[in-house]
Amino acid sequence: MNIKLFKKVFLKIKKLFKPADKFTYVAMGDSTVEGIGSSGPKKTFPALVFASIKQEFKHAKLHNLGRGGAKISDVISSQLGSAIQLKPDLVTISVGANDLRNRTKLKQFRNDLSQLIEVLKRKTDAKVIVNNIPDLSHLPSIPFVFRIYSKILLKRFNQIIQEQTHKSQVILVDLYSQSKLFANKYPEFISSDGLHPSDTGYALWANTIITQIKHLFLNKQQIKTQF
């Protein structure tokens, strides 16, 4: 038998015998994934999402690869390889804010996002969820003079995220509309640094993602939200 064919058949058979309560969740992205602004690791949005997954999959594992300051090129170079090796069932991607701040070319961002999603789809069996960039224009840490400019550019980045997720047939979570709705009325959703979400903000973020996960994997009657 051809070695490549044998390996392919072996992996399929191995997957059939995977215990039903095992589940691997990999979170990729920037400081929002790492949880900057939260009061601790258990209050990050990946940890809150994982807590809901754990209700259904007792032996589930979370691997949080998020790093502060990461642009999409950093996610590809520093996180993608690890994510593939972990053989995830679910991958969430939160990236783009640092590309906006560091003026990554829109064409480059588009190409990198397409590459990131397509490699994950090709080399893993994971369901992929990508969130767009929350509205940054109302954040206290953003100088007023830059708010209009950032809002215009943000819409362009989010348009790319929408187009690429649709093209690649992965799930888009719309955090932009949600953050725009709450930014002015609920300042407690923003942490003391004036930039990142607070515990409450991350809980709201997590619930938006959990809603999507329920439709993909979980028993809707048993899974509880985190906020």
Task: Enumerate the predicted regions with their spans.
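Serine-esterase "nucleophile elbow" of acetyl-processing enzymes
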Residues: 2-68, 80-87
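Active-site micro-motifs of SAM-dependent methyltransferase domains
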Residues: 33-34, 55, 69, 99, ...
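Short N-terminal helix/helix-N-cap motif within the alpha/beta-hydrolase-1
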Residues: 36-37, 73, 102
